[in-house]
Amino acid sequence: MTDRRTFLKKSGALAAMTMASASGLKASGITGTQVERILPGRLKRGDLIGLVTPGSSVTEEQLNDCISKLEEMGFRTTYNDTVLSEYGYFAGKDQERADELMEMFTREDVDGIWCVRGGYGSIRILDLLDYDEIRKNPKVFIGYSDITALLTSIYQECGLVTFHGPVGTSDFNRFSLKSMKKVLMEADGDYKYPYKREKGSRNNPEFDQYTLSGGRAEGALIGGNISVLDSIIGTRFEPDFQNKIVYLEEIGEKTYRVDKMLFHLLSGSNLKQAAGIVMGVFGECNINDAPTLSLKEALDDLLIPLNIPVSYGLSFGHIKRMVTIPTGIMAAMDADKNSLMLLEAAVV
């Protein structure tokens, strides 16, 4: 892994709250969005997937690689000519990228939308999207990292469940594929997320699983990349974390920067009112100049005082083996067991 900046260059209606059980389970309903929640239709072999680049640009080789991966899953693909556009570090100008995404939502023949890459730029098109049209044309939308801005905003503005999972440049290995297919292609709930440590990470503490604060919680899922979430605090697209299970990941930020961004999220939003927090892998966020806190020490300092269940090390983030997490779906976490389980289907 490389630091985040180098990495970027390289690559519904409110549900009633359930009462806490005698075992100490903290439970919460689906809150925060004032519109009715919508589940997209499940993906099936033969479906047409629209490819988009809402952030950084991609090469023709990366696009073709993405197409090959999706075809191996049994999908067909389509894309606009602008998918290979370049404007500085963006995949075209803001309006171009927004129009590209809107075209895929409004095209009746497109069944799902896959981001080819993250990078940077999604935040700049949030104000340019027609959320009413997106709501009228619900479909699977998947990506991660920079795409966090779109995942949270589309969910909160439209009620549409979105998916934090591999982009087209990610590794479509057996572990990741199994999770993608389970979440995107099967309309069943009760899915307990698997865990598999990355190869070659045995001596890397960033891949260790551990509990910061024990306990169990239920709530709708919301979250993504910390630096992206931090960047939309104070905007109309600021995520509502209250009574949610918040999932967080990061890459290539020194510990003091993770500390600063997480502190801002805690101070500038309602993250303190989350039902629980589950963290993925914070790759290369533990490389620091002395004197410093370790990543674990910084996370402990900030999150243990919240007195909610918090765990670290689930298989998501900027890693090869990642699970697919649906924003807006009810889930249960057990911080003592470092487990996360979907309680309902994410597609219909």
List the predicted regions and their residue ranges:
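N-terminal small/polar loop signature for handling phosphorylated ligands or for N-terminal nucleophile
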Residues: T82-P138
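C-terminal active-site/capping subdomain that shapes the small-molecule cofactor and substrate pocket
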Residues: R257-V348
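Oxyanion-binding "anion nests"
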Residues: L221-D259
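C-terminal segment of N-terminal export signals and the immediately downstream linker at the start
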Residues: S23-V58
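N-terminal secretory signal peptides and thylakoid transit peptides that target proteins
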Residues: M1-A15
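Conserved anion/nucleotide-ligand pocket segment
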Residues: F163, V167-N225
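Short beta-strand elements in bilobed, periplasmic/extracellular small-molecule ligand-binding domains
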Residues: R76-Y87, Y247
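Short, acidic/small-residue loops that bind anionic groups at enzyme active sites
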Residues: Y131-S153, V161-G168
